[in-house]
């Protein structure tokens, strides 16, 4: 499933791994430094935390400037198996439904990739998502 996740370009927006900056790194224009407990830590959020137009087509306009009104922030997928509703509006109740609603930049490729998988490969991908 994890290999399919990468092959389907899901990992472009749902970035698997980040490493935090080193301890004592100055952040927020010098207002803070990163404490030792948070420096150089590897996390697996499965998100780039950026805004993307995934073409949800629901007409929900997000707050913000004109350039981002139809964009939503990539949600972290860690713990996604515990969420009863998926996507930005909570209208998807299964992984398959959520994948089918991806469109726009990159989302169409991922959706089409999923649609062309065998039933067994779809099950493998969904099992991987359920493991996060």
Region spans (language model):
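Periplasmic c-type cytochrome electron-transfer domains
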Residues: 2-132
């Amino acid at each position: 499933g994890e290999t399919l996740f990468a092959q389907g370009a899901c990992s472009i927006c749902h970035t698997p791994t980040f490493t935090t900056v080193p301890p004592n790194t100055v952040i927020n224009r010098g207002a803070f430094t990163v404490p030792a407990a948070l420096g150089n830590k590897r996390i697996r959020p499965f998100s780039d935390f950026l805004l993307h137009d995934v073409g949800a087509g629901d007409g929900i306009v997000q707050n913000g400037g004109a350039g981002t009104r139809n964009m939503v922030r990539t949600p972290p997928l860690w713990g996604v198996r515990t969420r009863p509703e998926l996507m930005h509006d909570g209208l998807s109740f299964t992984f398959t439904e959520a994948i089918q609603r991806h469109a726009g930049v990159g989302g169409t490729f991922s959706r089409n990739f999923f649609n062309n998988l065998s039933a067994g490969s779809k099950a493998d991908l969904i099992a991987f998502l359920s493991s996060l």
